[in-house]
Amino acid sequence: MDTLTTRFAARLERAGLCPPGRALVAAWDDTIGFSRPDPLTPVLAEAMERLGVGCLILAPAAEPYRTILEWQAAREAPAICPRDCETRTFFHDIPVVPDPTPEAMVAALSRRKGAYLPGYGILAHGALSPEQAFVTVSSVAFAGFVKFFTDALERVRQGRLDAPWRGALTRVVAALPPAPPEQPPRLAEGPFATRTEAVAAMVAAGRATVELGLVDSVFGNISYNIDGVLGISQTGAALDTLEGCLDWCPLDGSSCAGLTASSELASHAALARVDGRRAILHGHPKFAVIMSMDCPETACPERGNCHTRCPRPRFLGETPIVPGEVGAGPRGLVHTMPPALVGRAGVIVLGHGVFTAGRDDFNEALASLCAIERQARADCLSALAV
């Protein structure tokens, strides 16, 4: 069990979510095992037993997430309330845990998957495995980041970015990783005639997307169309470890392989039917999501429902921004994303992420994803004057 817990602690570090040697992962086997010794291990063990879960993670946040989450927790307790797609889908809000006790942890985690403990880090539980808790830690960090910058942009627009806010913003910007490169690494050139070739290309493109910071590994998806059969990442598959996690789904619906495919299968299939490009890449680059949520129409009657009902054509440069929730429901992005992407390099789904496409391989799709995120980051920091 120590091997399992230390593996997930190392994964948190590689993802840039936690400083080296700081993650505390607890998981059940015949007893509760921990990734490292810590004075809080008895507290986490008692919280796990009360919750009846298989795993509990306490992840001290790496910068800039630490500055962001400490800032938000101090000002928004008892709960941080982001508005991005991941929060709407997974959390509703992020409880702020008032003290490092089993009682306080259980009170928060009995109603939410993740929480924030000021001075300590992100708390997350998994009913069965550390993978579930890892996903939650990643989502809390992403949601906090997006909320911090969308709040800052709104304050600039309202003339309310005061000195404390400016100081926090300066610290966060100083800790940002580099922007995506103008020339991303070259990937295999298509078209790919066999599934073996396409799988290798998707594995490499998924890994590059994660390494460039364009998606957290547990989110996003990827597909490639070979003669009307769509190879697509499975639901919950990590983009940087796609080996064995791809399904082949006929576009004519003649197979049930799509049962384990990405939740965005319907959107990928809809795009494949109307666009001749074979390669589709979907990431969650943070600044593109942030800028998609930045709107000057404060009196809009759909304010608060922007992610599904935005009534106005919006763009980031030449890239359209469309509403649409996850899946194929009546307000699903399956209805908005495909027509917007036809003939364009990419499209941003409001509060969610970016879809791009390439004719024969993933080089064009990856380059477009980088370019959209670079422009979004530049526009955001320019608007904030930092």
Predicted regions and their residues:
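Glycine-rich flexible loops
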Residues: 1-386
